[in-house]
Swiss-Prot record:
This is Phosphatidylglycerol--prolipoprotein diacylglyceryl transferase. InterPro entries: Lgt. It comes from Streptococcus equi subsp. equi (strain 4047). The keyword Transmembrane applies. Catalyzes the transfer of the diacylglyceryl group from phosphatidylglycerol to the sulfhydryl group of the N-terminal cysteine of a prolipoprotein, the first step in the formation of mature lipoproteins. Its main location: membrane. Its EC number is 2.5.1.145. The chain crosses the membrane at residues 12-32, 46-66, 83-103, 109-129, 167-187, 194-214, 226-246. It comes from the Bacteria. Pathway: Protein modification; lipoprotein biosynthesis (diacylglyceryl transfer). A 1,2-diacyl-sn-glycero-3-phospho-(1'-sn-glycerol) binds at R131. Signal peptide: none annotated. The gene is lgt.
Length: 259
C-alpha cells in the first residue's frame, strides 16, 4: 500500500490527494491562459477567475458530498473539514465553478460561452489527473474481482482492499477524460468546423457518458431515491448539451474564433 502522505514538513503533511489536485490545477491554468488570447481574453482574466473559483469550487464540492452523506457527517461533525481524506464530489465543484464563472463574466463583461469553451479541455485534463488522488486514498473503486493481471503491479497492489482486488474505476475515468482531452485538442485545431459552445458541449456529453457508465461500477456512490446521484447529473448534462448544440448551430455568425 502506498502511503497517502507525500511528505511532511514539521507538523504539516501534504497528501498525494492534494498533490494530484494541485498538479491538475496548474496544468489547467497554463492551458487556459494560453488559449485565452485566441478567444479575445487575457491570461489575467483566467488567473483572476481561478483565484476566486478554485477555493469556492472545493468548498462546493465538499458541501455537495457532505449533503448526500449527512447521515454520517451529522454524527461526525469534525470530519466535515477533513477533505484530505477524500470526499469531494466533482459535480459539486463543477456546479459551483459554473455559477462563479457566470457571475465573474457578468462583472468583467466577458462572454461566458467563450470562457466555458476555454475551460472545458483544461477541466477535463485536471479531472484526469485529479482522479489519481482517489488511487492514493484507495477510494472511488468498484466491486471485488479475482484478479487484475492486465494492470501494472503498483496499481494491482493499491487496489487490493479489504482482502480483495477492486475494479479501478478511478483509472477508467482518468483514461476516459484523457482521451476526451486529446480529442478536444485535436478538434480545436480545425476551428472552421466549430461554433461557439461546441467544445463545452462536447465536454458535457463526453464526460457525462463516461461517468454514467463508470459510476454504475462503483460501490461508494452517493444515492438519491435508489439511483446514483452522479448518473442523474450525467443524463441531465448530456440532454442540456445536445439541446445547446442544436440551438447554437441554427444561429449564424458565431464562429469559434472571432476575427
Amino acid at each position: 500500500m502506498i502511503n497517502p502522505i507525500a511528505f511532511k514538513l514539521g507538523p504539516l503533511s501534504l497528501h498525494w490527494y492534494a498533490v494530484c489536485i494541485l498538479v491538475g490545477l496548474l496544468l489547467a491554468v497554463y492551458l487556459a491562459a494560453k488559449e485565452a488570447p485566441r478567444k479575445k481574453m487575457t491570461s489575467d482574466d483566467i488567473i483572476d477567475f481561478i483565484l476566486i473559483a478554485f477555493p469556492l469550487a472545493i468548498i462546493g464540492a465538499r458541501i455537495y458530498y457532505v449533503a448526500f452523506e449527512w447521515s454520517y457527517y451529522s454524527q461526525h461533525l469534525s470530519d466535515i473539514f477533513a477533505i484530505w481524506n477524500g470526499g469531494i464530489a466533482i459535480y459539486g465543484g463543477l456546479i459551483t465553478g459554473t455559477i462563479v464563472l457566470f457571475v465573474y463574466c457578468y462583472y468583467k463583461v466577458l462572454n461566458p460561452i467563450h470562457f466555458l469553451d476555454i475551460a472545458a479541455p483544461s477541466v477535463m485534463l485536471a479531472q484526469a489527473i485529479g482522479r489519481w488522488g482517489n488511487f492514493f486514498n484507495q477510494e472511488a473503486y468498484g466491486r471485488a474481482v479475482s484478479q487484475l493481471n492486465y494492470l501494472p503491479s503498483f496499481i494491482r497492489q493499491q487496489m487490493f482492499i479489504d482482502g480483495s482486488y477492486r475494479v479501478p474505476t478511478f483509472l477508467y475515468e482518468s483514461m476516459w477524460n484523457l482521451i476526451g482531452f486529446v480529442i478536444i485538442m485535436v478538434w480545436r485545431r480545425k476551428p472552421r468546423s466549430l461554433v461557439d459552445g461546441d467544445i463545452i458541449s462536447f465536454y458535457l456529453i463526453w464526460y457525462g457518458c463516461g461517468r454514467l457508465v463508470i459510476e454504475g461500477m462503483r460501490t461508494d456512490s452517493l444515492m438519491l431515491l435508489g439511483i446514483r446521484v452522479s448518473q442523474y447529473m450525467s443524463v441531465l448534462l448530456i440532454i442540456i448539451a445536445i439541446v445547446f448544440i442544436f440551438k447554437r448551430h441554427r444561429q449564424k455568425g458565431i464562429s469559434y474564433y472571432q476575427e
